[in-house]
From Swiss-Prot:
Biased composition annotated in UniProt, kind: Basic and acidic residues: 541-552
The gene coding this protein: CHAF1B
In-chain residues carrying the UniProt-annotated modification Phosphothreonine: 394, 419, 433, 495, 509, 521, 531
Pfam family, one: Beta-prop_CAF1B_HIR1
Polar residues biased stretches: 469-495
Gene Ontology cellular component list: CAF-1 complex; chromatin; cytoplasm; nucleoplasm; nucleus; protein-containing complex
Protein name stated in the entry: Chromatin assembly factor 1 subunit B
Region Disordered: start-end pairs: 386-559
Molecular function, one GO term: histone binding
Length: 559
């Protein structure tokens, strides 16, 4: 695993808000789209150099938006690129095979001459009233969902360019949206602190998730806390994601309150019960803002001894969680991260994306730069020869049947073998196998290990009160020079930096030396129509000064 922050002025040194790798090209080319405050969408070619690091080449500048662009997403086939921005429109781009470039009023002639590819807008989707924050495609590429500052999410028929459904249950900005690969749900996450899961077939809310029980009060009343951060989060994105097989829903921007302590986390939901999480993945320091899954299915790691699994799948899936200042790498065979990347950017991260073969993980930041994590062949695992066949449902072909979602509470928690007794799990949920026989990755130099939140030794106890998280101030000038910290399992508990070679985790490694996730078992209250009860319910401020307040051309990059 290697990391490089490319010295490229991706968007004229303006903040980069989103990026996305093109899939469906059978590995012929790693094409990457990026978007930022400069109102442009840009296409890049990413290759792996002889030293294993990423090499980036400019391909095209797509100029049609009139305000900042917040999100770019390729369709599953890779033919169409969707972009959404502060101008409240969604543009659908496609490569123009004509040799003569299209005349665009928004693009300078000098910039157009640099283009190696010609992209043209094939459709413009108008329906949102305010900034578009997130976009996701259906698996077949015929439908699309978008999330906006106007408190709504819209389902689009891409071929007709028309709205199918408008979901307006949220009370504040909708900052993330994801499409179920099996075609049954669309999930949204808002700064009103509510996760809403919609039934695509019924076109209405199936689940509302907002609060979790924290214990019983002195007088016997049930106490609860809010599961998600309020609008004090420094990020304007909460990019949640289903796993490629649809078995899990991964939601960032989570927070766990235990007494006076507040822990940032990412919640893991099983599609068998989307009312409450089966686990949460603590993140040290800062709130999480994006989750993206590697599209490759991997073979299970061999194990030395059999234990109770947390996520029982016949294959292994890998996903990345981005916080405000770091990226953690997880897989479905264990509940703690196997990789950690930090200290690569001066400002808040904004988006992450995997290449189709899992060789690259791209990271964008509001400091105007992007980084790449590269993986050698089979470093993440041995890919399956054939992907599993998904049993998809579409609005046109799905039968109107009763919901198959479990409506009762799951059996009580029980200890997981080979882990601290206080770590419990829902037996109906997917499982994980302890990675005693994990293959050793390539040797890596470990420097300045960060302080990691210790594992919680008991289920979340006692009554808790709602807390408002205050964003920490940033001082760019006082930040030290960039450096990359790659942490894997054996470096988490070290207190002083030292050079070591990575070796597989031994069977006798004490549990206290490994950061573990907390398996959440209390029930979640289902809220049918709720107005957030926190005192500070005002919308967040604008992301940044508008473009007309920060005019400036392309600047040469300092070495």
């Amino acid at each position: 695993m290697k990391v490089i922050t490319c010295e490229i002025a991706w968007h004229n040194k303006e903040p980069v808000y989103s990026l996305d790798f093109q899939h469906g090209t059978a590995g012929r080319i790693h094409r990457l789209a990026s978007a930022g405050v400069d109102t442009n969408v840009r296409i890049w070619k990413v290759e792996k150099g002889p030293d294993g690091k990423a090499i980036v080449e400019f391909l095209s500048n797509l100029a049609r938006h009139t305000k900042a662009v917040n999100v770019v997403r390729f369709s599953p086939t890779g033919e169409i690129l969707a972009s959404g921005g502060d101008d409240a429109v969604i543009l659908l781009w496609k490569v123009n095979d004509n040799k003569e470039p299209e005349q665009i009023a928004f693009q300078d002639e000098d910039e157009a001459q640099l283009n190696k590819e010609n992209w043209t807008v094939v459709k413009t989707l108008r329906g949102h009233l305010e900034d578009v924050y997130d976009i996701c495609w259906a698996t077949d590429g015929n439908l699309m969902a978008s999330a906006s500052v106007d408190n709504t999410a819209i389902i689009w028929d891409v071929s007709k360019g028309q709205k199918i459904s408008i979901f307006n249950e949220h009370k504040s900005y909708v900052q993330g949206v994801t499409w179920d690969p099996l075609g049954q749900y669309v999930a949204t996450l808002s700064c009103d602190r509510v996760l809403r899961v919609y039934s695509i077939q019924k076109k209405r809310v199936a689940f509302n998730v907002s609060k979790m029980l924290s214990g019983i009060g002195a007088e016997g009343e049930a106490r609860s806390y809010r599961m998600f951060h309020d609008d004090s989060m420094k990020s304007f994105f909460r990019r949640l994601s289903f796993t490629p097989d649809g078995s899990l829903l991964l939601t960032p921007a989570g927070c766990v309150e235990s007494g006076e302590n507040v822990m940032n986390t990412t919640y893991v939901f099983s599609r068998k019960n989307l009312k409450r999480p089966i686990a949460h993945l603590p993140c040290p320091g800062k709130a999480t803002l994006a989750v993206r899954c590697c599209p490759v299915y991997f073979e299970l790691r061999p194990v030395v001894e059999t234990g109770v699994e947390l996520m029982s799948l016949p294959y292994r899936l890998v996903f990345a969680v981005a916080s405000e200042d770091s990226v953690l790498l997880y897989d479905t065979q264990q509940s703690f991260p196997f990789g950690y990347v930090s200290n690569i950017h001066y400002h808040t991260l904004s988006d992450i994306s995997w290449s189709s073969d899992g060789a690259f993980l791209a990271i964008s930041s509001t400091d105007g730069y992007c980084s790449f994590v590269t993986f050698e062949k089979d470093e993440l695992g041995i890919p399956l020869k054939e992907k599993p066949v998904l049993n998809m449902r579409t609005p046109d072909t799905a039968k109107k049947t009763k919901s198959q979602t479990h409506r009762g509470s799951s059996p009580g928690p029980r200890p997981v073998e080979g882990t601290p007794a206080s770590r419990t799990q829902d037996p109906s949920s997917p499982g994980t196998t302890p990675p005693q026989a994990r293959q050793a990755p390539a040797p890596t130099v470990i420097r300045d290990p960060p302080s990691i939140t210790p594992a919680v030794k008991s289920p979340l106890p006692g009554p808790s009160e709602e807390k408002t998280l205050q964003p920490s101030s940033q001082n760019t000038k006082a930040h030290p020079s960039r450096r990359v910290t790659l942490n894997t399992l054996q470096a988490w508990s070290k207190t002083t930096p030292r050079r070591i070679n990575l070796t597989p985790l031994k069977t006798d490694t004490p549990p206290s030396s490994v950061p573990t996730s907390v398996i959440s078992t209390p029930s979640t209250e289902e809220i049918q129509s709720e107005t957030p009860g926190d005192a500070q319910g005002s919308p967040p401020e604008l992301k940044r000064p508008r473009l007309d307040e920060n005019k400036g051309g392309t600047e040469s990059l300092d070495p």
